[in-house]
Curated annotation (Swiss-Prot):
Gene Ontology annotations for the cellular component aspect, listed alphabetically: nuclear speck; nucleus; spliceosomal complex; U2-type catalytic step 1 spliceosome; U2-type catalytic step 2 spliceosome; U2-type precatalytic spliceosome
The protein, known as: Pre-mRNA-splicing factor CWC22 homolog
Domain MIF4G: residue ranges: 161-344
Pfam families xrefs: MA3, MIF4G
Biased composition (Basic residues): 720-729, 848-863
Example of a GO MF term: RNA binding
GN (gene name): Cwc22
Localisation per UniProt entry: Nucleus; Nucleus speckle
Function: Required for pre-mRNA splicing as component of the spliceosome. As a component of the minor spliceosome, involved in the splicing of U12-type introns in pre-mRNAs. Promotes exon-junction complex (EJC) assembly. Hinders EIF4A3 from non-specifically binding RNA and escorts it to the splicing machinery to promote EJC assembly on mature mRNAs. Through its role in EJC assembly, required for nonsense-mediated mRNA decay.
Chain spans, region Disordered: 1-127, 403-442, 652-908
Keywords: mRNA processing, mRNA splicing, Nucleus, Phosphoprotein, Spliceosome
Chaperone as UniProt keyword: no
Organism name: Mus musculus
Amino acid sequence: MKSSVAHMKSSGHNRRETHSSYRRSSSPEDRYTEQERSPRDRGYSDYSRSDYERSRRGYSYDDSMESRSRDREKRRERERDADHRKRSRKSPSPDRSPARGGGQSSPQEEPTWKKKKDELDPLLTRTGGAYIPPAKLRMMQEQITDKSSLAYQRMSWEALKKSINGLINKVNISNISIIIQELLQENIVRGRGLLSRSVLQAQSASPIFTHVYAALVAIINSKFPQIGELILKRLILNFRKGYRRNDKQLCLTASKFVAHLINQNVAHEVLCLEMLTLLLERPTDDSVEVAIGFLKECGLKLTQVSPRGINAIFERLRNILHESEIDKRVQYMIEVMFAVRKDGFKDHPVILEGLDLVEEDDQFTHMLPLEDDYNPEDVLNVFKMDPNFMENEEKYKAIKKEILDEGDSDSNTDQGAGSSEDEEEEDEEEEGEDEEGGQKVTIHDKTEINLVSFRRTIYLAIQSSLDFEECAHKLLKMEFAESQTKELCNMILDCCAQQRTYEKFFGLLAGRFCMLKKEYMESFESIFKEQYDTIHRLETNKLRNVAKMFAHLLYTDSLPWSVLECIKLSEETTTSSSRIFVKIFFQELCEYMGLPKLNARLKDETLQPFFEGLLPRDNPRNTRFAINFFTSIGLGGLTDELREHLKNTPKVIVAQKPEAEQKKPALTSSSSESSSASDSSDSESDSSESSSESSSDASDSSSSSSTQSSTSGITAHSAKGTRKKRQGKARGEEVDKLARGHQALERRREGGREDQRHQEGRTERARSERRRAQNSRDADWRDPLAKHIDDRSHENSHSRVGNGREQGSHREPEDRHGEPKKRRERRDSFSENEKQRSRNQDSDNVRRKDRSKSRERSRRHSGHKGDDARCQNSAERRWEKPGRRPEQSRESKRSQDRRREKSPTTQK
């Protein structure tokens, strides 16, 4: 046992010595080769672990010691082999001693090696050269005078690469505009390969900033489309490479970048649909996950530009969810994707705020399919000497000036470099002129970003307040500009309109602001007029809330009642929306104030000029419309005065006629008299002519006498009229001008009534002519029909002797029972004489009365000469009709008596 322990100690001591010598002699290259050993060579730790486990399992101590000694021997052999390999591989190192290197080198070989080392160019090494301090770099640049030389181009290439990498790594949302300006200062046309590589590397390293890099690429693409195309080509190739290699991370980063480029309109949406189709064609867990991540980023954009395409994609996802055997986690991801689509991608907007920096006209969209062969142009990543280096640099400077408008900055730098004092003064004058011109320029913010933020602030303050007093206090503490006063009032009204039902909170808040300052009250007045003019644009719910809010403001006298001046109630000036607004408005006022108080307010004499449109009195049609409107909405009590006004309108018109007639001279009255007299005479002559056709010679003489008397009256009146006409011609012309307007209005109003009168006159004439023709035919008949006609004539006559008519009517039945003929003839002759006298007297009285009435009417209604004359003519004819019938019956009686006398019965 002791010998074995001594052997173990000696072997352990030898091992430590060899190990320490190995550690001392190992260089970094030796360690590198040691790391590259196979796992079999590094397996001694595993062997020791197995030995330990064996000892724990109960193996004998001797067996364990033997196994350990065998392991140590094997380890020593491996170490010897490794040392032998290292010595054979090592090349002679110059900084080693000759003893350590194993060979002796002469001192003459050392300076030749140093010369070779000095001749090596650091820029040609794999890493691009070691770090050069700035002072030494400036020194080297000063030594190079030829800018077209290879060394200068290489140095400028290295500087370009460093600046592009630094700017890309610094970009974010807040400084993207500054980074773009600095980036355009560099020659990105020459370094487009470097720029593409830097952008793709930065995006793959930090995918969370993909939207920022996409906005950067969109801006560069608007100025240099070939750079955007190169980046998109490399992205497509990266995606295809990751898809072939089943590299999910590469596919995720590439697809996310492509999605944001589609949102920025750099890539076409067809590329997106092709990528989704490829990913979902043979679905796996990874491909579905990549497709869902891709769809979340550009789903809203696809919904806008290609709804049919995105519907097909979601239909495919639904089939995968129901049919394919995929992991539970992926199934949940698909369900979440459908929920995101249902919410409208609200957490995944197309372009984030602050990154929409390219105008639509400047955007350039690349149509690059997924399956085409593209050249990544990796040569652009490596330095290559340009024979036209200076010319290309000058061209890019011109492009840079055009993009950045650097003419002014270049002139300022030239002045600072050293120019004459005269040139400085001229430049200062030009700058002063530019400043003066700049003061005149007004910039209009079409995006209205400030307005949107202001409205958002007001909305949040309103929604976070418990009562209107707290809200008013918050809004007043904001201290906004006076120009935004109306916008504040508009926002209060909009918030009120957006509510599902009217809340008194907004009415109290608006009333508080109106009480605080006159400017708020004036703003709400103008808003009321604008809202009423554009009320047809609001929905019914919003319209109701707006009407109730303004009703509250008028009830509390926060707004003056003069705002109702803009309401014009008529059939032409109102729409369905405006009538609904007025209805809700006045019903709400009636609930607040009560009908008596509201009626008293509307009858206020000081406010009547403002209520002329609301309660119109200018036109009976509008008045009737207003009455019907307020009655239909249950507020008929407000229209009592309007109803009285509508009833009194004809009386007022009649009362205004004498006043107009008094102003007229005697000319108009005389002319009206003559016209009325002539009309009456015409009517009489017509009646006499009609009677002469059906009567005998006696009736012809009476009608001719009446005609002569009427014509004599006509000539007398016409003579008087001509004399008065000559006297008052000068005065009549002036009054006629004043009366014409009034006459035209009255004629229009009474046109309908006169038409009815004319129609009645025509029907009456037709009836009289029928009766005349019937009487003329009935004259040849015997006793029964003659008696019946005689009875009718007695009933219709207007005589003072009524007993004779009664006797005649009572005698008819006696004649039927056989009364003697002689008595009947005597009674008939007596009654006929009495009837004749009474008829003549009645006709004379009627004619006198008609003439007096016609004169009075002509004086009162001078403006209606022709119309009144027609009415009088028809009236005279009505009065004359009873007179005609007795005359006709009288003639028929006489003819009957003659026949009886000539008959043989009477002779006997």
